[in-house]
UniProtKB/Swiss-Prot annotation:
Antagonist of muscle and neuronal nicotinic acetylcholine receptors (nAChR) with highest affinity for neuronal alpha-7/CHRNA7 nAChRs. GO terms for cellular component: extracellular region. The keyword Secreted applies. The lineage of its organism: Eukaryota, Metazoa, Chordata, Craniata, Vertebrata. This is Muscarinic toxin-like protein 1. Keywords: Disulfide bond, G-protein coupled acetylcholine receptor impairing toxin, G-protein coupled receptor impairing toxin, Neurotoxin, Postsynaptic neurotoxin, Secreted, Toxin. GO terms for molecular function: toxin activity. Expressed by the venom gland.
Length: 26
């Protein structure tokens, strides 16, 4: 899974794109 939006990041657990909250990453 590739996230193109800079506000999203790929979750290593669910392998889906999720929204980033500041410096909080999954």
């Amino acid at each position: 899974t590739i996230c193109y939006n800079h506000l999203t990041i790929r979750s290593e657990v669910t392998e889906i794109c999720i929204i980033c909250d500041d410096d909080y990453y999954f």
